[in-house]
């Protein structure tokens, strides 16, 4: 019997975009799929539109979220619990997949039954596919864990096909987090040795929309979201030590610095200071790096960064912690790669 792909889609107030997503699913050359849309309390016509599609094609089903807490990852996990697929794929209601997406992904996975998941190339767009002409990201010489530390991820939620059993075994999405859910998920996969390959020899099959309604600066640096980042970093440190990779703790310095500098810029100096003390005790930053970070904290605390010389000094002290990620920055004229590589 052909393998069934379960497409799990959280929805919330996407009446203007959800039809495009549904149409792209209906256009698949691989007919063996089901789509479970779990609605998170939409107040517009999103549910009505999905229900109209479901009435025309029984492979599409819509549910109201019943799990807690509210949020997209809760909807995704609840969908996984209800689905029947051999594979699971996550698709948001503002993204679009190419007609060959499922067929290429299934055939890639079935060529190697030992894989837990596979990563596929995707493109960024704003209004219509190809309008930005940018890769989501490209292959580089560094291993995936190194790139994850540097905030230069090659994998994100919609660009991956998971074997359902593997996704359940890894623990699914972490519902305690408000941000960095994708980052935390793939840290778990890489550190714990899940088997994967990148099939960047295949054509891009996903169009990932640049969201104009992204978090404002105030929302992005809200205390609860900063604590979510802290939780991810601490969990990564725990996993590294538990999996015999404590020697990689210093690579956390990029994440540590990003969290601390973000907290400092938003006035959360107590959080920044306590997290710096934790990072130094764990070996995530060296004595010299801690001193450099502490200098930046002092400049923010004194509000001297309002003035040019102090602001430039703070920027210079932060520069060594930049991860130089290229997500959404590489034009499609740059080759993405021409090989399938990973952790076989």
Q: What are the language-model segments listed below?
A:
Residues 24, 31, 39-48, 69, ...:
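A conserved acidic beta->alpha catalytic loop
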Residues 100-132:
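Conserved donor NDP-sugar-binding/catalytic core segment of glycosyltransferases
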Residues 3-6, 24, 34, 184:
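Cell-envelope/extracellular polymer assembly enzymes that use nucleotide-activated donors
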Residues 184, 191, 198-344:
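C-terminal subregions of glycosyltransferases and related glycan-biosynthesis enzymes
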Residues 88:
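Short aromatic/hydrophobic "clamp" motif used to bind/position activated sugar donors
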Residues 65-83, 104:
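Glycine-rich, basic loop-to-helix element that forms the pyrophosphate-binding segment
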Residues 5-17, 21, 28, 38:
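A conserved hydrophobic helix/loop-capping motif in glycosyltransferases and polysaccharide synthases
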Residues 72, 120, 140-229:
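Conserved nucleotide-sugar donor-binding catalytic segment
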């Amino acid at each position: 019997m052909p393998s069934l792909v379960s497409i799990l889609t959280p929805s919330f107030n996407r009446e203007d975009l959800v039809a495009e997503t549904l149409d792209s699913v209906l256009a698949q050359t691989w007919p063996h799929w089901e789509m479970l849309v779990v609605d998170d309390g939409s107040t517009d016509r999103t549910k009505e539109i999905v229900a109209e599609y479901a009435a025309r094609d029984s492979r599409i089903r819509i549910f109201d979220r019943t799990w807690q807490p509210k949020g997209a990852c809760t909807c995704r996990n609840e969908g996984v619990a209800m689905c029947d697929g051999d594979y699971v794929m996550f698709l948001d209601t503002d993204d679009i997949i190419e007609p060959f997406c499922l067929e290429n992904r299934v055939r890639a996975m079935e060529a190697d039954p030992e894989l837990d998941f596979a990563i596929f190339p995707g493109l960024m767009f704003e209004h219509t596919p190809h309008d930005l002409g940018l890769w989501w990201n490209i292959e580089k010489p560094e291993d995936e864990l190194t790139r994850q530390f540097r905030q230069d991820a090659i994998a994100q939620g919609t660009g991956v096909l998971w074997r359902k059993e593997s996704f359940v075994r890894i623990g699914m999405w972490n519902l305690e987090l408000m941000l960095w859910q994708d980052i935390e998920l793939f840290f778990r996969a890489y550190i714990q040795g899940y088997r994967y390959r990148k099939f960047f020899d295949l054509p891009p099959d996903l169009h990932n929309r640049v969201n104009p309604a992204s978090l404002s600066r105030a929302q992005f640096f809200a205390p609860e979201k900063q604590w979510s980042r802290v939780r991810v970093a601490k969990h990564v440190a725990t996993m590294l030590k538990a999996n015999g990779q404590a020697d990689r703790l210093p690579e956390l310095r990029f994440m540590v610095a990003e969290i601390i500098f973000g907290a400092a810029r938003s006035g959360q100096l107590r959080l920044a200071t306590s997290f710096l003390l934790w990072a130094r005790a764990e070996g995530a930053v060296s004595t010299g790096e801690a001193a450099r970070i502490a200098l930046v904290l002092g400049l923010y605390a004194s509000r001297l960064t309002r003035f040019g010389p102090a602001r430039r000094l703070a920027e210079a002290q932060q520069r060594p912690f930049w991860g130089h990620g290229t997500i959404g920055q590489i034009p499609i004229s740059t080759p993405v790669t021409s090989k399938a590589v990973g952790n076989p």
